[in-house]
Amino acid sequence: MLKIGTFDLEERPAIVAAISNEPLQQCKTAAEHGADILEIRFDLLGITTSKEAANLLRMLKGTTSLPCIATNRLQSQGGNWEGTEENRIALLEDIMHLTDAVDIELETDEQLRDRIVKKAKEESKTTIISSHDFERTPDKETLKSILDHSHDAGADIAKLAVMPENMQDVLNLLEVTLEVDDVCTISMGKLGKHTRIIAPLYGSKLTYASVSDAVAPGQLKVEDLKKAMEMME
């Protein structure tokens, strides 16, 4: 069974709201607008210590029942973390017991990535291993290889976000989504914007949305994504 917290991803895909500023207000708004899960973007919130991160998660747990994904994104993968890699990883390890899932990049140093995967397994937390390409969409075999590599590295969910150069790139990603289990796939930007609505129909377990400003190219707002997905049911 694949879950994040109490949310059963085998019953239906989840709308994940990316929390990037004013966390208490954004979490409240996300819940009101139909989000299923919250992604707490420590790197965008300017949180740099384990104590700050833990305090925030405790506050959020006191105000919402939605499950949380802890993310502390590398700059090279679209994030804003400015500290050392050791501190980035240590923060995620230290707050693991307070979250429901953790997102770690496939491109992270293997030993550091393995530390997060090991800790998540010990704490019975869901592990998302993610990869982002903001320039292009690789060929289908490479897309599958990246997802397989993430699963081999210990991912419960392999997340892949790529930038299409044409509609064939978008179709290729959707076809791979249909073929590989337990994935989250996103075709970014204007060309791929619709995949945030339809990729779940092909097997994507998660689809990400914003509460205010988009944190990734082509990201829709929670309420708009919720309405669109309900139309597809």
Curated annotation (Swiss-Prot):
Coiled-coil region: none
Family annotation (CDD domains): DHQase_I (cd00502)
Enzyme class: lyase
Pathway recorded for this protein: Metabolic intermediate biosynthesis; chorismate biosynthesis; chorismate from D-erythrose 4-phosphate and phosphoenolpyruvate: step 3/7
Function (record text): Involved in the third step of the chorismate pathway, which leads to the biosynthesis of aromatic amino acids. Catalyzes the cis-dehydration of 3-dehydroquinate (DHQ) and introduces the first double bond of the aromatic ring to yield 3-dehydroshikimate.
Sequence similarity: Belongs to the type-I 3-dehydroquinase family.
Subunit and partners: Homodimer.
Protein's name according to its UniProt entry: 3-dehydroquinate dehydratase
Lineage: Archaea, Methanobacteriati, Methanobacteriota, Stenosarchaea group, Methanomicrobia
